[in-house]
């Protein structure tokens, strides 16, 4: 898919490097979560802008994913709960307090828990989740998987 995913690729690469060195650094763990989240935000902005004429780049992260998946797939990804948890991790890293954001506010499933701390385990999980979401989205939409994934 070439250069269209440069930001996504670069952010995911940074997230991986940060997560690998996060064992004794909360700052690196937080940065890894933010970079993994940013990689997915870059992807949804790029693909959403190409696929949806009225795509709102300024919308929040989860509503953009919800809109993109509904319009391109007619459904949400199997990884939807992981997207919600990644958003909750990002919020925790930034000091957000309150109810976690949902992909679908009407959902009857319990919302993700917001962790008290963001550490190395959460950083590794965030990077792997971003990789899984990118792979699932490409497979579900019939797009070629990027060679850097």
Show the residue positions of the predicted features.
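Acidic-leaning, charged glycine-interspersed low-complexity segments
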Residues: 68-75
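Charge-enriched, short contiguous segments at helix-coil
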Residues: 75-149
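Non-catalytic, well-ordered alpha-helical scaffold segments
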Residues: 9, 30-37, 41, 80, ...
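Amphipathic, well-ordered alpha-helical segments in soluble domains
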Residues: 11-14, 35, 89, 129
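Short, flexible helix-adjacent loops and helix caps
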Residues: 20-24, 48, 52, 98, ...
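Charged alpha-helical initiation segments
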Residues: 1-29, 138-149
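Short, contiguous, well-structured surface segments enriched in hydrophobic/aromatic residues
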Residues: 31-64
């Amino acid at each position: 898919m070439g250069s269209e995913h440069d930001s996504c690729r670069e952010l995911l690469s940074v997230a991986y490097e940060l997560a690998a060195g996060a064992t004794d650094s909360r700052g690196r763990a937080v940065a890894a979560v933010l970079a993994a989240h940013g990689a997915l935000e870059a992807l949804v902005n790029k693909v959403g802008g190409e696929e949806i004429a009225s795509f709102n780049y300024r919308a929040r992260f989860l509503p953009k994913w919800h809109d993109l998946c509904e319009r391109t797939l007619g459904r949400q990804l199997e990884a939807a709960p992981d997207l919600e948890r990644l958003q909750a991790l990002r919020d925790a890293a930034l000091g957000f307090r309150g109810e976690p954001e949902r992909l679908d506010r009407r959902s009857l499933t319990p919302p993700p828990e917001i962790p008290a701390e963001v550490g190395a385990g959460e950083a590794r999980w965030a990077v792997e989740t971003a990789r899984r979401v990118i792979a699932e989205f490409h497979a579900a939409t019939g797009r070629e998987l990027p060679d850097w994934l």
